[in-house]
Amino acid sequence: PDPLVDLFKKVLPHQPHHGTGKTHMASALCMLACERRLEARFFTASSLVMRLRRARDEGRLDREATLIGRARLLVIDELGFLPLDPDGARLLFQVFADAYERQSVVITTNLEFSRWGAVFGDDQMAAAVIDRIVHHGRLVQFRGESYRVRNALMQEG
């Protein structure tokens, strides 16, 4: 077993503040996987749902799911940033269900688990996703002020 793959096994960077480095860390893990010649995929949650919806509408959802499932590392960024409609929630749930115990998954979010029911529009579906994540997962919390705010050109004064 590759220790790098073990490192990213279901990592969940979480911090209820923007600009603390969650996406940066997820991108770095994706790049590291690629440097190790491991297939990796990086999506925002909303772009992944749009991609899956388009594939389904074009009759190629199984093929798209297979392509996503081939990646050793799957990054889903900004989960909960935009709400999911019921159809999108079901499509995203299927990605989590397919990835469970087969792929390493990194999810970035600003939301605590208690708020995921609102994201998926269904408390039971959210609970099933959370159950799969926490089984083998690691929660990584980011603290501090926003990097973008700290380094903003537009400052008070």
In which residue ranges do the predicted regions lie?
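Hydrophobic anchor at the beta1->P-loop junction of P-loop NTPases
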Residues: 14
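Walker A (P-loop) ATP-phosphate-binding motif of ABC ATPase nucleotide-binding domains
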Residues: 11
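Conserved lysine of the Walker
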Residues: 22
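Short, well-ordered alpha-helices that flank and scaffold nucleotide-derived cofactor binding pockets
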Residues: 31, 35, 54
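Pre-Walker A adenine-sensing motif
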Residues: 1-5
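The conserved Walker
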Residues: 18
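Hydrophobic positions on the alpha1 helix immediately C-terminal to the Walker A/P-loop
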Residues: 25, 29
